[in-house]
A protein has these predicted regions:
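Short, well-structured N-terminal submotif of metal-dependent ribonuclease cores
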Residues: 1-34, 46-57
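A general structural signal for well-ordered alpha-helical segments in protein cores
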Residues: 19, 39, 55-58, 71, ...
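Short active-site oxyanion
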Residues: 29-32, 63-66, 100-102
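Short secondary-structure boundary segments
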Residues: 36-37, 91
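Acidic, metal-associated active-site segment
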Residues: 42, 88-102
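Acidic catalytic patch
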Residues: 63-84
Length: 102
């Protein structure tokens, strides 16, 4: 299973210089997990930069994969990761999600 960080989604959606790096993981929807936090972050950024229609299209693409809710277990695992690895909350939630799903 793969988890693509929100920055990876945004790079892919913008067809940025590193979009190809993320494309194979994003297009393999059967093996892709999308934390709900990623939905929030991507929707917000695309809404801000390109408008609601593009933002809705972005999250529609994301929802073709398996959506992972922020469960109590993930919410309690992420702070430990954040403190141990000295990373921000969003990154620790992404990492906790990836670790929880193998």
């Amino acid at each position: 299973m793969n988890v693509v960080d929100s920055s990876g989604w945004l790079e892919y959606l913008a067809d940025g210089p590193n979009a190809d790096f993320f494309a194979s993981s994003i297009l393999a929807t059967a093996d892709l997990l999308v934390p709900t936090l990623s939905l929030y972050e991507v929707f917000k950024r695309v809404l801000q930069q390109r408008g609601e229609d593009d933002a809705l299209q972005a999250v529609a693409l994301m929802q073709q994969a398996t959506i992972v809710e922020l469960s109590a277990a993930l919410a309690l695992s992420a702070p430990r990761i954040s403190l141990n690895d000295k990373i921000p909350i969003a990154d620790s939630i992404m990492l906790a999600t990836a670790r929880a799903h193998g």
